[in-house]
Regions:
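Intracellular loop-helix junctions on the cytosolic face of multi-pass helical membrane proteins
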Residues: 1-7, 132-140, 162-379, 402, ...
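A gly/Pro-rich, aromatic-decorated transmembrane alpha-helix motif that marks the paired
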Residues: 28, 62, 85, 152-168, ...
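Helix-loop boundary and gating motifs at the non-cytosolic
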Residues: 3-53, 301-311, 369-380
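C-terminal ends and interior cores of transmembrane alpha-helices
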Residues: 79-99, 366-377, 424-455
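Hydrophobic core of transmembrane alpha-helices in multi-pass small-molecule transporters
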Residues: 17, 99-121, 445-476
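Loop-to-transmembrane helix entry/capping segments in MFS-fold secondary transporters
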Residues: 42-43, 133-146, 230, 381-382, ...
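Hydrophobic alpha-helical transmembrane and interfacial-helix anchor sites in secondary transporters
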Residues: 66, 126, 164, 405, ...
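Central cavity-lining transmembrane alpha-helices of secondary-active solute carriers
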Residues: 47-68, 155-157, 389-406
Length: 555
């Protein structure tokens, strides 16, 4: 798995881990932040969220074009600096007035621009490492490992966001309750119903920070303190970027030969031989067809920060008991994820000593995870953002499983091509949303709840199961798609084509808002049903053009 990979892969992967940790910490609380601070509706919040995600993934198109001319490393460094300023602006506490909104949108613009310069170009540099014939056969597994490293950062992000939010909110004598922000805004806006006012009063009575406050004062104070706690959560991203820069520059000698522009790559024999116009056209056409398909995958997948977060808040139990508790402790998840790698090491090691050491480590990690679980309270309170740690956990834990399966198939000459894996990923994604559809059948519509939490709450295991299946889909589609772009893109347009991959992701992220717009208008199962249909139609399309896509890698 890690054997015979160039050192540059690990340096670039770790640098990306730090940046992604900050990004996903911010993303875990962003939707909740704008609803709590500004009182935005679900439709407006998901629209802002989707536009931001679209910008984050669209800007790499321009970043890639620029990097093809001036070099990938220069763009990566500039991107980190711009992102840092953006996160710093987002971390500054402001009021919910116009100036606060302007600063927030300016911060989002800076983060999107910085990400555009950083994200795609770092991955092009990873791909450049594998233009060396010595490492060419390792390209697909390298991008799976790189993708796994991204998700290590993402796995810890929701827990960090939760810890920071709870710490600063707790210092003011408050605790997080999902009902309060919406009820507080209704109270301040004069639209609260009598029964909801009674509910808000009951919640306020249970908090020491509300002592001596009338309901209006409590509402404003709670919103202010919660918003400020979120601001501090955004500040974590600044720290993670500093770590990312330190890794990038301290290990730069490991990948310096991959830091070139398009002309330098050709001059140094870094890229493959010049393609004919017909070959170039064939490859670009194949890539554009793949880009068209992945739009709908990302539209569905990135509901994790939009409608799936709303579903976690309004329809899912806020406490867990029994064995499910282990999934809501980041340390136990980390130990379990690491144990997967040591277990594989025990089977794959070529020496008896290596097998023994890996076996002992696996047992120790399992005992550690059980010790963490045994020390947890009988009932654990959870936040909506906690669910976002499951997807990266599953990515980290399942990556070696995925590599082992496809490695075994490759030895038999039966490994599916990258385009075929993408098509299978779309089908698996449809299965994931089918689980959520079934769970939603007997639940009240969001419109009927009027901004409150449903009286009928489902087990968190429904959402966890959905995240598990969607992760299988993601592992089939995302790292394989990036590897496909890296392999098929004409040498002159590597940065631009990687940027187009992210531009397709951007369009999918913009379309994330469509289910959000439907959220308060249709039944829950209709929201998930739309995503199922889109995933299945996309799978049908990609399988219908499979021969064209597979032939592009041969020309």
């Amino acid at each position: 798995m890690f054997k015979d990979q160039p050192k540059g892969l690990f340096a670039l992967a770790l640098a990306n881990t730090g940046e992604r940790f900050g990004y996903y910490t911010m993303l875990a609380i962003f939707l909740l932040f704008i609803q709590a601070k500004f009182g935005f509706s679900a439709a407006v919040s998901t629209q802002i969220y989707s536009i931001f995600l679209a910008a984050v993934y669209f800007m790499p198109l321009f970043g890639g074009m620029l990097a093809d001319k001036i070099g990938y490393g220069k763009c990566v460094t500039t991107g980190i600096a711009v992102m840092f300023i953006g996160y710093l602006c987002l971390a500054i506490p402001t009021g919910p007035d116009l100036s606060g909104k302007i600063l927030m949108f300016a911060a989002l613009a800076l983060i999107a621009t910085g990400t555009g310069l950083f994200k795609g170009n770092l991955q092009v540099m990873v791909g450049n490492l594998y233009d060396d014939p010595k490492y060419a056969s390792k390209r697909d597994s390298a991008f799976s490992l790189f993708y796994m490293a991204i998700n290590i950062g993402a796995m810890f992000a929701p827990s960090m966001a939760k810890a920071v939010t709870n710490f600063f909110l707790g210092k003011s004598g408050f605790t997080y309750v999902a009902d309060i922000p919406a009820l507080a805004h209704q109270m301040l806006g004069g639209t609260i119903l009598p029964e909801n006012a009674d509910k808000l009063q009951t919640l306020a009575n249970g908090m020491s920070g509300a002592a001596g406050m009338d309901l209006a004062t409590f509402s404003q104070t709670y919103i202010d303190k919660l918003s400020t706690a979120y601001n501090y959560g955004f500040g974590v991203a600044c720290i993670s970027l500093i770590i990312s820069v330190a890794i990038y520059y301290s290990c730069r000698s490991w990948f310096k030969h991959a830091d070139v522009n398009a002309k330098q790559a050709q001059a140094a024999n870094h890229a493959e031989a010049e393609l004919t116009p017909a070959q170039t056209k064939s490859r670009i056409t194949a890539l554009m067809l793949v880009f068209a398909v992945v739009i709908f995958f990302w539209m569905a997948f990135h509901q994790n920060g939009a409608t799936m977060t709303l579903f976690a808040r309004d329809y899912t139990a806020s406490t867990v008991e029994g064995a499910t508790r282990i999934g809501f402790n980041i340390f136990s998840l980390f130990l379990i994820a690491v144990s997967v790698y040591t277990l594989f090491g025990a089977f794959q090691s070529e020496t008896k000593k290596g097998k023994t050491i890996c076996g002992i480590c696996t047992a120790a990690l399992w005992l550690g995870a059980y010790a963490v679980y045994a020390g947890m309270p009988a009932k654990v309170n959870i936040l909506p953002s906690d669910f976002q740690q499951f997807n990266p956990f599953f990515v980290v834990a399942l990556t070696p499983v995925s590599l082992a399966i496809f490695g075994a198939l490759a030895k038999k000459g039966k490994e599916p091509s990258a385009p075929r894996k993408i098509g299978l990923g779309m089908i698996v994604a449809a299965v994931g949303f089918s689980i959520l559809t079934f769970a939603s059948l007997n639940l009240a519509s969001p419109k009927s709840l009027n901004g409150t939490v449903s009286p009928d709450l489902i087990s968190p295991e429904w959402l966890i199961s959905t995240y598990l299946v969607l992760t299988f889909a993601e592992l089939l589609l995302s790292p394989m798609g990036i590897s496909f772009v890296s392999k098929v893109a004409p040498p002159k347009y590597k940065g631009a084509m990687m940027g187009c991959w992210f531009a397709a992701t951007a369009l999918g992220n913009y379309l994330v808002s469509i289910p959000g717009l439907l959220w308060n208008k249709v039944e829950l199962w209709c929201v998930w049903g739309l995503l199922i249909v889109l995933c299945l139609l996309s799978a049908l399309f990609i399988f219908s053009i499979m021969k064209k896509l597979e032939s592009a890698t041969e020309c």
